[in-house]
């Protein structure tokens, strides 16, 4: 019985379409066996369908389930002769001018492309069923040349394809028609939604690759290398292991990861990441990052991983944990990162290096580990810029600012961006410099008189301070920690002259412990700034002043040594106390006002202590006298009187012991006051005016006390001192000093 070729051809086409539809359905075992039997019969019938040597039927499942050939013929209502061939084929075959008959819907499908696949030709294998050939999803990125050949996998593809003939001349199985090949999905953000993917049935000759045999899913995916580069590799999931091959010709994988021991995370593409990523992480190991083309493809791989590891079967404790809500968490972290990056934008060269075209540069390490906090970034910036710091100049008044609470690095809000500057508070003004130790004029100066300091600037900046003047914000500062915030708060409150107490301010967005740290630091810095001499330090170089003072002291000593003894006995109208460099370096650089006030205060304390000590000594003399009298009476008293006298003596002894303890405490305190007085006199030049009236005993006594502590450089001056000074300095200490000098002289 002769079979018509056209009905038979139509039957084969429809059966192939039916088989393709059944491939995507869930079938029973019996139906699956029947389907495989029909498919095997079709393979045997296909070579004898037409008079040609071999007819390859190219079928595909479109998104709506219809045949690729049928949908193509319904869409394109034109002659196949209108499809142009490449110019190279026309040169090789000049006899291509021939007539082409108009095809019908029952004609054979169009030929396969005959151009080599592009460089980044992309394939993805559909999970295999028993006896079913693998299917591949092909795509190409626009960035690669159209005629490049993939290494390894595609070198022999042209030889494996049979030749076909469709209504005319014989051709190779490849064609240059891009309409028949699938469009691509670009990795670029703006081309994510381009194109649609088509599934092609490849001939059985292509199934001979060893890596893809018996695999659940396979594809050429991009793998991230150590330093951020991407390399294309054949990735296969076989049994419960993830394997990567550098080439499809390799027999053994160079990366083999057990899926039952690793966690899988899907990271979607966003403004920072240019690719959809799958991260396979082993406990205590590095992450294997693979790039997929779309979210759908990532979900397909995740579904296969779940099936392989047992999560798809509803196990209670999956061996390969999947982190829930990872996408939402990454989006939230990304938004927080972008906000913090814009808030903590660095300045200078670092800003130009970090930000380019409005997007931050990120390396491979930062992409794997995420972002760092603003404080850590600020510390890293300081470490990097440590070697760039300028050495102190010879004329610099202070070689180090680290111990001055009024100086330090602080974040400043400039044009809605936070920049780090070196700040210094001095003379009621806030000076902002680009770097520490700059000698130039500060680029910003803020007057602090009459301003108000308010802590806090929202939940993202809990350690910020706002400086308000007349209700308007003139500056916004941000410290790196609670201690720095308290230090700056206390200094600014003192400089602004505000009556607000650091503990009475309202602190938002910080816990109780942090508030306690802020208040403690603010109280200390406030007390330091409001002390007697916090704002009277010399801000000028002091070494030259020391040399000048030494020269003046030597000249004045020579002049004084030539005076007569009668001149030295007279009180001078004013007493000038010189400043000595050795003591000044030891006790700090004091200003003139600070030295005068400290000297007066210590002199007054010294007088009060000496008066109190004298009263205690007088009381002790009286108590000891009573005790001696009581003991004398005990010798001639009766027994009853002795008991009463013994109790009286005991009480007197206790009183003497208490008084003696008080005297010792006051003596120690007096010694400390005298030491402080020496420091204050050595720290600055003091002029104590005395009135010309000889009856004013207080100022005369004050002058005598101060003169007693003058440094003596000449033995003749020591002998010229009046007896009153010797009387005031008598004691065990002076006696021992004199004995030591006499021993040293002999």
Curated annotation (Swiss-Prot):
It is found in: Cytoplasm; Cell projection, Podosome; Cell projection, Invadopodium; Cytoplasm, Cytoskeleton, Stress fiber. Residues 88-206, 336-371, 539-596, 723-746 are annotated as: Disordered. InterPro entries: AFAP, PH-like_dom_sf, PH_domain. The keyword Coiled coil applies. SUPFAM superfamilies: PH domain-like (SSF50729). Residues 214-310, 406-497 form the PH domain. May be involved in podosome and invadosome formation. Residues 350-359, 736-746 have a biased composition (Basic and acidic residues). Residues 108-119 have a biased composition (Pro residues). One of its GO terms (cellular component) is cell projection. The keyword Cell membrane does not apply. This is Actin filament-associated protein 1-like 1. It comes from the Eukaryota. Residues 591-682 form a coiled coil. Keywords: Cell junction, Cell projection, Coiled coil, Cytoplasm, Cytoskeleton, Repeat. Residues 98-107, 562-575 have a biased composition (Polar residues). Residues 139-148 have a biased composition (Low complexity).
């Amino acid at each position: 019985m002769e079979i018509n070729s056209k009905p038979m051809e139509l039957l084969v086409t429809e059966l192939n379409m039916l088989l393709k539809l059944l491939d995507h359905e869930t079938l029973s075992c019996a139906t699956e066996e029947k389907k495989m039997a029909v498919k095997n019969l079709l393979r045997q019938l296909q070579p004898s369908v037409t008079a040609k040597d071999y007819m390859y039927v190219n079928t595909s499942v479109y998104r709506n389930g219809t045949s690729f050939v049928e949908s193509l013929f319904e869409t394109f209502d034109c002659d196949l002769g209108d499809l142009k061939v490449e110019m190279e084929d026309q040169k090789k075959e000049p006899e291509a001018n021939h007539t082409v008959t108009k095809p019908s819907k029952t004609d054979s499908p169009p030929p396969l492309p005959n151009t080599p696949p592009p460089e980044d030709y992309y394939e993805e294998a559909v999970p295999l069923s028993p006896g079913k050939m693998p299917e591949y999803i092909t795509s190409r990125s626009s960035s690669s040349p159209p005629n490049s050949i993939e290494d390894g996998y595609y070198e022999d593809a042209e030889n494996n394809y049979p030749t076909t003939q469709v209504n005319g001349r014989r051709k190779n199985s490849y064609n240059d028609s891009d309409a028949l090949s699938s469009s691509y999905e670009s990795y670029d953000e703006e081309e994510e939604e381009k194109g649609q993917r088509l599934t092609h049935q490849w001939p059985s000759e292509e199934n001979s690759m060893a890596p893809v045999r018996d695999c659940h899913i396979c594809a050429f995916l991009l793998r991230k290398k150590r330093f951020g580069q991407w390399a294309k590799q054949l990735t296969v999931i076989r049994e419960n292991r993830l394997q990567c091959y550098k080439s499809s010709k390799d027999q053994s994988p160079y990366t083999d990861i057990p899926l039952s021991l690793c966690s899988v995370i899907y990271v979607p593409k966003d403004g920072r990441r240019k690719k959809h990523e799958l991260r396979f992480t082993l406990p205590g190991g590095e992450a294997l990052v693979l790039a997929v083309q779309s979210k759908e493809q990532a979900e397909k791989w995740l579904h296969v991983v779940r099936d392989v590891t047992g999560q798809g079967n509803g196990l209670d404790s999956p061996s390969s944990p999947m982190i829930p809500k990872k996408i939402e968490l990454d989006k939230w972290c990304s938004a927080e990162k972008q906000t913090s990056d814009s808030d903590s934008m660095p300045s200078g060269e670092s800003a130009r290096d970090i930000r380019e075209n409005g997007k931050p540069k990120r390396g491979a390490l930062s992409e794997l580990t995420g972002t760092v906090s603003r404080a850590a970034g600020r510390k890293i910036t300081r470490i990097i810029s440590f070697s760039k710091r300028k050495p102190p100049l010879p004329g610099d008044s202070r070689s180090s600012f680290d111990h001055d609470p009024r100086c330090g690095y602080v974040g400043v809000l400039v044009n809605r961006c936070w920049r780090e500057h070196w700040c210094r508070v001095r003379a009621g003004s806030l000076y902002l410099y680009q770097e520490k130790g700059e000698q130039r004029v500060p680029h910003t100066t803020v007057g602090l008189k009459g301003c108000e300091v308010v802590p806090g600037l929202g939940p993202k900046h809990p350690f910020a301070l706002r400086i308000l003047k007349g209700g308007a914000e003139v500056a916004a500062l941000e410290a790196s920690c609670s201690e720095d915030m308290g230090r700056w708060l206390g200094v600014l409150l003192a400089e602004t002259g505000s009556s607000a107490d650091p503990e009475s301010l309202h602190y938002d967005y910080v816990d109780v412990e942090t508030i306690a740290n802020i208040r403690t630091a603010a109280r200390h810095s406030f007390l330091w700034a409001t002390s007697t001499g916090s704002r009277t330090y010399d801000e000028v170089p002091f070494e030259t002043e020391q040399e000048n003072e030494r020269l003046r002291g030597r000249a004045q000593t020579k002049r004084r040594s030539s005076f007569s003894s009668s001149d030295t006995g007279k009180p001078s109208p004013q007493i000038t106390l010189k400043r000595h460099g050795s003591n000044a370096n030891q006790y700090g650089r004091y200003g003139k006002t600070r030295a005068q006030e400290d000297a007066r205060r210590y002199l007054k304390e010294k007088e009060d202590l000496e008066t109190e000590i004298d009263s205690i000594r007088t009381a002790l003399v009286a108590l000891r006298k009573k005790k001696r009298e009581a003991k004398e009476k005990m010798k001639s008293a009766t027994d009853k009187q002795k008991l009463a006298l013994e109790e009286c003596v005991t009480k007197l002894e206790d009183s003497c012991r208490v008084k003696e303890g008080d005297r010792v405490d006051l003596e120690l305190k007096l010694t400390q006051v005298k030491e402080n007085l020496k420091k204050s006199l050595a720290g600055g030049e003091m002029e104590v005016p005395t009135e010309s009236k000889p009856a004013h005993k207080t100022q005369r006594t004050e002058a005598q006390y101060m003169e007693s502590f003058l440094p003596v450089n000449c033995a003749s001056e020591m002998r010229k001192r009046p007896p009153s000074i010797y009387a005031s300095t008598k004691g065990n200490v002076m006696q021992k000093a004199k004995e030591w000098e006499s021993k040293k002289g002999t």
